[in-house]
Amino acid sequence: MTTFHERRLTLNIEITLRLATQSDLPKLEWYGQYTHFRAVYRRTFQEMEHGNRLMILADCQDFPIGQVFVQLRSREKRVAQDQQRAYLYSLRVMEMFRGCGIGTQLVQEAEAMVSAMGYTWTTIAAAKTNPKARRLYERMGYVIFAEDAGEWSYTDHRGIVQFVHEPCWLLEKAIGVR
């Protein structure tokens, strides 16, 4: 019988932070895990083309392994407001890459981009059921300023409206020169 000895490999993988392109949209579904957000991704990309949002990706060998989206304008001024507040949302990193600092880098890149655009505050939401996200944001200097019912809806890939109820904390952070 052959004896197998466990071996470990250390990989150095290059990750590029960049804005999404049209060709990234199908890949954002992560092999079916997020297919239900297909229409959301398409609409968000169109909003980015019109200067209302940003879609920042962590790219590994031409595949998005992480993302954060930024809303630059909103009717709800406490979340996003022209040249004052930008709202970071949909922060996501593939499970096998979590704990490597990619989420932190995505948030920092979003902060740097909106600061360069003249924004002085960023806001982000942490689901009350996700204490790890809240701790991450607080470590990065975010402070809770409100609670939100977290009620929203989206149209899935089959054209069916899905309603979401995800109570959350709203956190904010001063960025750039004020």
Residue ranges and their predicted role:
Residues 50, 84-85, 118, 163-167:
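Residue-level preference for beta-strand/loop junctions
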Residues 90, 94-108, 117, 128-135, ...:
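Conserved glycine-rich acetyl-CoA-binding loop
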Residues 10-13, 19-96, 107-108, 113, ...:
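Acetyl-CoA-dependent GNAT
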Residues 1-11:
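Short acidic N-proximal helix/loop "leader" segments that mark the beginning
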Residues 43-58, 114, 118-138:
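Generic detector of contiguous secondary-structure segments
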Residues 54-56, 62-70, 133-149:
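Conserved long hydrophobic alpha-helices within structured protein cores
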Residues 120, 127-130, 138-178:
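C-terminal "cap" of GNAT-fold acetyltransferases
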